[in-house]
């Protein structure tokens, strides 16, 4: 593999997934010996104020703006024509030009849909091999452009959707979504149980409550579940200090059953020992769950890519989708008591995972970029 190539990775922080994939690909580049690798949060660098406002609105869509986001997501996908979205087409254009002039990349990798990047080829005539690494288990047309040289997708389902709208099958490679390598490492569980004060003889429910819009009334749900002495609950509150504080009294009265945690760096450890997890259907979290075979319960997915992700996993028999708060307790209780269902969901989850995605993607990108560059040189020689 030619590690002398200069790589520019472009991303955006609308949710953590796109940035995390960019970071994983960056780490893979460095581990393979690439010296010239740059990651750019393009929209943030291009217009910080607009970026902050739109990120705020994006987060609010999980609570008060669901219908607006639904109309935007499905409406744009239905009528999408890049020429009609002239403002979006130009977003980040100046900063992109600066980055290209500064770094002169041989390869551009995109982990967030950015029309401005493939449009740069039309605008300047400069051919820089450009690749989309898609971060969900569904397709939105805003990812698609004739100047994207190859798409890297999670599943055959996403590939088929791309082919149906005119993408050549050879321009799509099913690789899975890049995740942090610790999720694919072999780690003994015994030390993890001890570290978090959990028993290996009782069921463990993991609630990822720190993410936006996952679950309300977490305390009430925990109170009800704690009536079963055979259930252990781990609530990851992330940066939600108020939630962690609200669970402190309950944690003190049930120290062996309830663990309320803040931000957890080695979250893969908890994935390894949990029997099922309540979370939101983000593409990265779901991919991490496939790596370790964690059955998931998805509560009221937000319309858009998360709802489409949820439908895919539900149809595949790897997730349970709950749309009413009053159904959560019964669904969780029934699942934890159903060994056959848990095992089936676990195996279905594992069957969706493709190992070493970042390595596969990087190797293929370098190979494809060589072909594109050689073809470009050949065409120039003929002219």
From Swiss-Prot:
Alphabetized UniProt keyword annotations: Carbohydrate metabolism, Cell membrane, Glycosyltransferase, Lipid biosynthesis, Lipid metabolism, Membrane, Transferase
GO cellular component: plasma membrane
Catalysed transformations (reactions): a 1,2-diacyl-3-O-(beta-D-glucopyranosyl)-sn-glycerol + UDP-alpha-D-glucose = a 1,2-diacyl-3-O-(beta-D-Glc-(1->6)-beta-D-Glc)-sn-glycerol + UDP + H(+); a 1,2-diacyl-3-O-(beta-D-Glc-(1->6)-beta-D-Glc)-sn-glycerol + UDP-alpha-D-glucose = a 1,2-diacyl-3-O-(beta-D-Glc-(1->6)-beta-D-Glc-(1->6)-beta-D-Glc)-sn-glycerol + UDP + H(+); a 1,2-diacyl-sn-glycerol + UDP-alpha-D-glucose = a 1,2-diacyl-3-O-(beta-D-glucopyranosyl)-sn-glycerol + UDP + H(+)
Gene3D superfamilies: Glycogen Phosphorylase B (3.40.50.2000)
One Pfam family recorded for the sequence: MGDG_synth
Major subcellular site: membrane
Pathway as given in its UniProt record: Glycolipid metabolism; diglucosyl-diacylglycerol biosynthesis
Compartmental location: Cell membrane
GO molecular function, one term: 1,2-diacylglycerol 3-glucosyltransferase activity
GO biological process annotation, one example: enterobacterial common antigen biosynthetic process
EC top class, as a word: transferase
Family in the record: Belongs to the glycosyltransferase 28 family. UgtP subfamily.
Protein name, UniProt field: Processive diacylglycerol beta-glucosyltransferase
Gene source species: Bacillus pumilus (strain SAFR-032)
